[in-house]
């Protein structure tokens, strides 16, 4: 019996060696915003290259934390790491961290108002007022004034926000900080903030779920989550004074200016961008790669993945409600991949 068990142990061990040699495992964690496209990409790339990329959709804040602590090989975030976070990463890991934009997306104001199925218009002032808790009724003049002919109820507004560290929150609060000095001074921007009002949901999925089950609620999710969950979302008044509902053209228009002046570290904000057709709550989302990998095989695989994702992989993005990267950004990234050692 012992001999049989010993033989089984050897056989299973050999099987493990074969599996290990046939497939490379890379671990990553971070943003939920791009998870639908990342899931598709990692599956496609893995099948073609024998690389299994295990990605945890845990939120940008957790992704930054995990990549800094070295518990994953790469991170992902919808908000670029700030200077303090980069310094903390360098101190912990003895190398730098690089940002690589992968796609463009949009945060949208989503709501669940019984009896109202039309797409509402939201001014910047109305959104800031709602999330500050100063506008508390759906028929408030700040909302009704931009939605003539819509019978809005006198019901209390229930604000829903993210409860976890979130790049989607970073985009939303970055926008609110640009259009409202009160928001900037009292709340500010970040992957996590001290919310003045509201209920918290974990992940884009959690916010979408809360919205669907909470009458008279308003929240924010990435565009694909609104579409997948069949949640109504509204148009937002942009910097040019036009109400724009999020779509691929509007997101691309928001990125047009930044594409020509992209900084070398790719850390840029495109919320409240100029342009008559620009959707104002748009953003790049980034993969976070160590400047120097400890494992050369993983380094080569991730460099190949990024190269594929920002070129051939862009053919997949529009079907999932993301916008393609501008050519100027792709060209700059391909050169920047040389910094990954």
Placement of each model-derived feature along the sequence:
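Sec/Tat signal peptide C-region and signal peptidase I cleavage site
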Residues: 14-20
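Bacterial N-terminal signal peptides that target proteins for export
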Residues: 1-8
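Flexible loop/hinge segments at secondary-structure junctions
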Residues: 21-341
């Amino acid at each position: 019996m012992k001999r049989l068990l010993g033989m089984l142990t050897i056989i299973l061990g050999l099987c493990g060696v074969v599996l290990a040699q046939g497939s490379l495992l890379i671990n990553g964690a971070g943003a939920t915003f791009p998870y639908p496209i990342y899931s598709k990409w990692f599956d496609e790339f893995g099948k073609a290259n024998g690389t299994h990329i295990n990605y945890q959709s845990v939120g940008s804040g957790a992704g930054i934390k995990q990549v800094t602590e070295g518990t994953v090989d790469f991170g992902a975030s919808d908000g670029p790491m700030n200077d303090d976070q980069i310094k903390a990463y360098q101190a912990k890991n003895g190398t730098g961290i690089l940002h690589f934009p992968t796609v463009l997306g949009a945060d949208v104001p989503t709501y669940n108002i019984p009896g109202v199925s039309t797409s509402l218009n939201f001014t910047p002032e109305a959104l800031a007022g709602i999330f500050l808790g100063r506008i508390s009724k759906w028929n408030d003049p700040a909302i009704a004034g931009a939605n003539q002919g819509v019978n809005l109820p006198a019901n209390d507004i229930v604000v829903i926000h993210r409860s976890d560290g979130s790049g989607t929150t970073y985009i939303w609060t970055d926008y609110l900080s640009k259009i409202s000095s009160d928001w900037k001074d009292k709340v500010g921007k970040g992957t996590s903030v001290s919310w003045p009002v509201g209920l918290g949901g974990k992940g884009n999925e959690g916010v979408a779920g809360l919205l669907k089950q909470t009458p008279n609620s308003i929240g924010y999710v990435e565009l694909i989550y609104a579409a997948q969950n069949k949640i109504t979302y509204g148009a937002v008044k942009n910097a040019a004074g036009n109400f724009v509902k999020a779509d691929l053209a509007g997101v691309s228009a928001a990125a047009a200016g930044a594409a020509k002046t992209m900084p070398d570290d790719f850390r840029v904000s495109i919320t409240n961008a100029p342009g008559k057709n620009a959707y104002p709550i748009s953003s790049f989302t980034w993969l976070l790669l160590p400047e120097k990998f400890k494992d050369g095989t993983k380094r080569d695989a991730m460099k190949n993945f990024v190269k594929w994702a920002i070129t051939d992989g862009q053919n997949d993005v529009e079907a999932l409600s993301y916008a393609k990267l501008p050519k100027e950004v792709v060209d700059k990234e391909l050169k920047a991949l040389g910094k990954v050692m």
